[in-house]
Swiss-Prot record:
Protein family: Belongs to the peptidase C19 family. PAN2 subfamily.
Segments forming domain USP: 485-924
Written domain comment of the UniProt record: Contains a pseudo-UCH domain. This ubiquitin C-terminal hydrolase (UCH)-like or ubiquitin specific protease (USP)-like domain is predicted to be catalytically inactive because it lacks the active site catalytic triad characteristic of thiol proteases, with residues at the equivalent structural positions that are incompatible with catalysis, and it cannot bind ubiquitin. It functions as a structural scaffold for intra- and intermolecular interactions in the complex. The linker, or PAN3 interaction domain (PID), between the WD40 repeats and the pseudo-UCH domain mediates interaction with PAN3.
Gene name in the database record: Pan2
Main function: Catalytic subunit of the poly(A)-nuclease (PAN) deadenylation complex, one of two cytoplasmic mRNA deadenylases involved in general and miRNA-mediated mRNA turnover. PAN specifically shortens poly(A) tails of RNA and the activity is stimulated by poly(A)-binding protein (PABP). PAN deadenylation is followed by rapid degradation of the shortened mRNA tails by the CCR4-NOT complex.
Protein name: PAN2-PAN3 deadenylation complex catalytic subunit Pan2
Residues covered by region (Disordered): 1179-1205
Length: 1205
């Protein structure tokens, strides 16, 4: 057939498929169908099929109104009247869907639903249309846009669907079950078993679900449980159709005869009140379809496939006069449907034609239909012409594309200034008559001006806002606040997460050095800046890295592991998750208020400056205690190499300052008590006159503190006013100072002293005072070791009060002298004797020079809640290890943002947004005083067998064989690795206005199981580590489907697994990394990240990258195993032993296919075939025909060394 005016995309079919029926010979053919019809050898060409206006439609009697072609020559498989709009939907055997609007059947939309299978059921919903094919359920908008595409099992053969409620769908077919699908989540929620297979028709009332079976039975099922309540054995052959109305059920079908199945002309009618059959109804046509059409009576419409239609009452006799003919173009009618208003009937035939019969000339498909949305016509060609002869023609009439770039008409930033309009003053009459209730004031309207009338004031006359004109607009563009004063590099940095996580986040943009930053998203990561300060103290770093003990949550051990990661990193950020995990378990930290909730940390509640100063005191005390408790552990035989002996602490030698506290009562009694402290707190003078104080004066006053207080006197035997003084006996090697700028009082003191110091500097370098000493100082500063020119600009000395060096000397009468020190003092002392003596002989005279090494500052930012950053002077040894150069340099450390800075920036404190919190001064030539040799304290004994923490763990359940002494790994050995995780905190995300999802904070994962298998030798594939990690933290989600971890597996009281501590397993992996083994696994980058390990890239063989093409998707281990190894893994849950073995086999396969990397082109072809196969299968592994649920895949290979898991 050739239909003009139809969609050009419709398929053409051969003449053999067309009907051979001659329309002229058919007495029942509607003559109106012959209008504009030409018969030719190629088929029938219909220019227009609608009924002519002369056709008369009798009210109350059904007759044909229109006939249209849905798809040329392709049989109609299903028809459905839309329940929301005035539309008729038609599906074909070719998988094509077409919709027609209104009684005129105007084509509305046409699109392909399935490329190979026929459409078997259509259901209209509020926002779209559901289409059911053989094994696919597709939800599409009425215009053809796919909303979701739900693939069923390939073995399914679906025929019917039923909308149980607005969100639940039942789908049945030729199998022995019915699926329940949630339309909100698009997931299968239930699978109901049916005793009689083959559910091809489903109906529903307020009492039952009705299921029609291919065996000829109709079952009535409960609405809640879907259990069979009643069953009617309607036909002995098969069921053709049935319908339900009120208390009646009518069915038609086929009965078994000697020659086979024959159409039964008796309709079976059942009374649902008595649940029994009533008198069958004999009809005069061969019934294939039937529907109740309850208008005035409960009429039944019975349709035969040849086109005959009969109306009759279900409880009366059929009248032959009620038969009429539909006149299909093809030989058979294929579908039949009735509109919700009962005013229209739709028939679809085998030639793709749709016939609409109505009982009125202007029928309505639904009692209440909403308005249909039509595509807007293109308005581009209908734009009005512009008359260029008009002088006042606005250029805004010309449409231009929206752009975010700067426009030519934009004013330059230098010529722009924010000019806020001041609120007008409140009328004096209003203030006089105002009454207040609480904080709300109200007054009668004085009627002095009109509503919304405000006097306009020019900018020149508003002198009160002149200061704003001095603030230039932010140079970075319109998006930033123009009055924001915090420098960009000091602002709180955040990680932008995408659907790939961190893989596409550019950390190099924030850190162009080879030093490692720290990630900020972990709970209580506010201490990142202090971790960096401790790391860049060379003696502290060596001491911590040499420490190892048996204590599970030892901060010194965890800090040493973190320092090792910072050593290995080449600019990539690290995370202190394991250190902070141990930190959260210490009761003292919680008692001091150092453990912040996520909400408090995100909102910046509390003072971060006070918090980090308390943390500073806590960490030094805790490290001092951990070092004092050091004993040679039995489990870790390599832990004996420590700096200090038992009972002493190198932390004490570095930080501790011996003090002498003297209490003098007014009775003359004096009490002296010795003590020590690890840090000092600045105590500021109460002077409000604006007097100039050197930092050295304030520091001396804070160290040698003198105060009056009430104290107990043994002589007086009562509390008496006493004078308490503190004298120093021994100076520390590292001087730690908490600034305690916690109020505006201390901030004003810093601001005032900085202003006074700046005035002195301007006078000094401005030429008013120029002595020989200053000249020497200038020349010395020009050759400073940091490589910066001193005072190249006066701006560098603004807000500077802190000296870069101080000199301290013990006096003979237990006193202390402190002064600000600059290198010019040493030059002047060469020619003139000084009370301090030459610096080169400082130890002989008890004189020490301290150089500023780090400053920790609190950044005040109301938009982000503030943050903590550190300025650190990185020494030569660190530059030598990282960059191969020998020099010193100041750096800004702001989490993962690291940037070199000028040395003066480290001591500039604008108290409006940059407040000092902690200062670190170190003795000059500190590194030469200590042994800085560091060695790895982890030995091979950590891999030997160890006891499990689980009380119920039995040896028969062992899933691994520990390494023997002759199996110890060597450099380059292969080890298969896999890890499973649980979730501690759920992901925090927000939904943007455009519908996209933005991750604010990723989910916090914790390692739950780590497995290592042998990669070579006779025992290849047998695990030697299979540790379940005990956790004391609250687990939100065990992720059992993906991890195989069940509740109780990580609890030492009830677990039957081999349970260990995270530290124990971490040491095993650290030893393997340090010895130089190569790890083989799938997705190892995430595994090492959660375990908190830094592994050199040449020791990682990740199959997710080995079998990956650039700019293509990553392929799952399950699909790779099925494609290359013909293995089906990860059936119900994941098993780490199975995954690790599979990764090893895939690596062997990679070496085989790529000829050990020698033939990359041939391997590239293999990868192309892999991706083509994956796209065809939608990256899903076909399920086996009979899949048994795996009870335990964690055991050893049967027969391997006689072990069976």
């Amino acid at each position: 057939m050739n239909f003009e005016g139809l969609d050009p995309g419709l398929a053409e079919f051969s003449p053999a498929m067309h009907s051979t029926l001659d329309p002229v010979l058919d007495a029942h053919l509607n003559p109106s169908l012959l209008q504009n019809v030409e018969l030719d050898p190629e088929g029938v060409a219909l220019e227009a099929l609608p009924v002519q206006e002369s056709v008369h439609i009798m009210e109350g009697v059904y007759s044909e109104l229109h006939s249209v072609v849905a798809e040329v020559g392709v049989p109609v498989s299903v028809s459905h009247f839309d329940l929301q709009e005035e539309m008729l939907w038609v599906g074909s055997h070719g998988g094509h869907a077409t919709s027609f609007f209104g009684p005129a059947l105007e084509r509305y939309s046409s699109f392909q639903v399935n490329g190979s299978d026929d459409i078997r059921q259509i259901q209209s919903l509020e926002n779209g249309i559901l289409f059911l094919t053989k094994n696919n359920l597709k939800y599409m908008a009425r215009g053809g846009l796919i909303i979701f595409d739900y693939l069923l099992d390939e073995s399914e053969d679906m025929h019917s669907l039923l909308l149980a409620d607005n969100n639940t769908l039942l789908v049945g077919g030729l199998q022995n079950h019915v699926l329940e699908i949630d339309l909100n989540t698009v997931q299968e929620t239930q699978k109901y078993a049916v005793e009689t297979p083959g559910v091809t028709i489903m109906r529903q009332t307020n009492r039952f679900f009705f299921c029609g079976h291919t065996s000829g039975k109709v079952s009535l099922r409960d609405l809640r449980s879907f259990k069979v309540e009643h069953e009617f054995d309607a036909f002995s052959g098969s069921l053709s159709d049935f319908d339900v109305h009120g208390n009646l059920l009518a069915a038609c079908g086929f009965s078994s005869r000697l020659t086979g199945l024959a159409c039964d002309r008796f309709l079976k009618v059942y009374d649902l009140r008595m649940m029994r059959a009533i008198t069958p109804l004999q009809v005069h046509v061969d019934p294939a379809f039937l529907r109740f059409i309850p208008t005035y009576t409960s009429r039944l419409a019975i349709i035969s496939q040849s086109g005959q239609c009969q109306f009759c009452e279900p409880t009366g006799l059929a009248n032959p006069a009620d038969i009429f003919h539909v006149n299909p173009v093809g030989p058979l009618l294929m579908t039949f449907d009735v509109s919700a208003s009962k005013q229209a009937l739709a028939f679809g035939d085998s030639e793709g034609c749709v016939h609409l019969w109505t009982d009125s000339p202007e029928p309505s498909f639904n009692p209440y239909s909403r308005e249909t949305e039509f595509a807007l016509p293109c308005l581009v060609d209908s734009l009005p012409a512009l008359d260029w002869s008009q002088d006042l023609l606005p250029l805004s009439l010309i449409p231009v594309p929206l752009t975010t770039d700067a426009l030519l008409s934009d004013w330059p930033a230098a010529n722009s200034a924010p000019a806020p309009r001041r609120a007008p003053p409140v009328d004096a009459e209003i203030l006089r008559t105002m009454k207040k209730v609480g904080f709300i004031g109200y007054a009668p309207n004085p009627r002095t001006r009109l509503r919304n009338q405000i006097p306009y004031r020019l900018k020149e006359s508003d002198h009160e806002f002149d200061n704003f004109s001095q603030v230039t607009e932010s140079p970075t563009g319109r998006e930033e606040e123009p009055l924001h004063t915090v420098s960009k590099k000091y602002r709180k940095v955040t990680i932008k997460y995408s659907k790939l996580g961190l893989e596409d986040f550019d950390f190099k943009h924030y850190n162009k050095t080879l030093f490692a930053g720290l990630e900020p998203h972990i709970p209580n990561a506010y201490c990142n800046c202090m971790i960096q300060v401790l790391y860049f103290l060379e003696p502290v770093r060596c001491l911590i890295q040499n420490h190892l003990c048996q204590k599970e949550f030892c901060l010194a051990c965890e800090l040493g592991f973190l320092f090792h990661m910072l050593d290995l990193s080449r600019g990539d950020p690290c995370q202190g998750s394991n250190f902070l995990r141990a930190f959260r378990t210490i009761p003292e930290a919680s008692a001091l208020g150092l453990i912040l909730a996520d909400s408090d940390e995100a909102s910046g509640k509390g003072s971060l400056a006070r918090l980090i100063q308390r943390w500073n005191r806590f960490i030094l005390t805790q490290l001092h205690q951990d070092m004092q408790e050091l004993e040679v552990p039995q489990a870790y035989r390599g832990a004996g190499g420590s700096f200090c002996s038992s009972g002493d602490s190198i932390i004490g030698q570095l930080f501790s300052c011996e003090m002498e506290n003297c209490s003098l009562c007014r009775c003359g009694s004096e009490t002296v008590r010795a003590s020590s402290t690890l840090l000092f707190t600045l105590s500021y003078p109460e002077d409000k006159t604006g007097k100039n104080y050197d930092f050295a004066q304030v520091l001396k006053r804070s160290i040698c503190l003198e105060q009056n207080t009430q104290a107990w006197c043994d002589s007086c035997e009562k509390y008496q006013p006493t004078i308490q003084t503190r004298n120093i006996r021994h100076l520390p090697d590292i001087l730690v100072i908490n600034c305690e700028v916690n109020s505006s009082k201390e901030a004003d003191f810093w601001r005032l002293q900085a202003e006074v110091a700046f005035k002195i500097a301007v006078k000094k370098f401005g030429g008013e005072v120029k002595s020989k000493e200053f000249a020497l100082a200038d020349r010395k500063e020009l050759r400073s070791p940091e490589g910066f020119l001193c005072c190249s600009s006066m701006e560098e000395l603004k807000n500077v009060w802190l000296p870069f060096s101080i000199r301290m000397k013990m006096t003979k009468n237990k006193g202390l002298d402190v002064c600000n020190w600059a290198d010019e003092h040493e030059l002047s002392s060469l020619g003139t004797p000084s009370q301090w003596g030459p610096a080169r002989a400082e130890e002989e005279h008890g004189v020490y020079v301290y150089d500023l090494m780090a400053t920790v500052v609190h950044i005040l930012d109301s938009r982000t809640g503030g943050s903590l950053v550190a300025h650190i002077k990185v020494g030569e040894t660190y530059h030598q290890r990282k960059e191969g150069v020998t020099h010193q340099q100041w750096y800004l450390f702001n989490d993962f943002l690291i940037e070199p800075i000028d040395k003066y920036e480290a001591v500039q404190f604008d108290m409006n947004w940059k407040v000092p919190a902690i200062l670190y001064y170190v003795k000059r030539n500190l590194n030469s005083r200590y042994n800085l040799n560091s060695k790895n304290p982890i030995e091979a004994s950590v891999l030997l067998a160890e006891a499990s923490l689980a009380r119920k763990q039995r040896k028969t359940h062992t899933t691994f064989i520990p390494l023997m002494l002759n199996e110890m790994p060597q450099v380059g050995d292969l080890v298969g690795l896999d890890a499973e995780f649980v979730t501690l905190n759920e992901e925090e995300a927000e939904l943007r206005s455009d519908g996209t999802k933005s991750t604010i904070k990723p989910s916090q994962m914790s390692v739950a199981r780590i497995t290592c298998v042998r990669g070579q030798g006779p025992n290849e594939g047998i695990p030697f580590i299979d540790d379940y990690i005990s956790t004391q933290e609250q687990v939100v989600d065990y992720l059992t489907q993906y991890s195989g971890i069940k509740p109780g597996d990580l609890d030492a009281k009830i677990s039957s697994k081999h349970l260990t501590t995270l530290k124990s397993t971490y040491l095993k992996l650290r030893f393997l990394i340090d010895i130089g083994v190569k790890f083989v696994g799938h997705g190892l980058q995430k595994d090492f990240r959660v375990i908190n390990l830094m592994v050199p890239k040449d020791q990682v063989l990740d199959t997710v990258y080995l079998f990956h093409m650039p700019r293509k998707r990553m392929i799952s281990l399950r699909f790779l195993a099925w494609y290359f190894l013909d293995l089906k893994i990860q059936g119900e849950t994941h098993d780490s032993i199975e995954d690790a073995r599979t990764a090893l086999q895939l690596y062997r396969k990679y070496l085989e296919l790529s000829k050990n990397g020698a033939e990359p082109e041939s391997f590239h072809k293999v990868l192309k075939g892999l991706y083509e196969k994956g796209r065809k299968m939608d990256w899903k592994v076909p399920e086996p025909e009979s899949q048994s649920s795996p009870k335990s895949k964690a055991g050893l290979r049967p027969g391997a060394l006689g072990w069976v898991g």
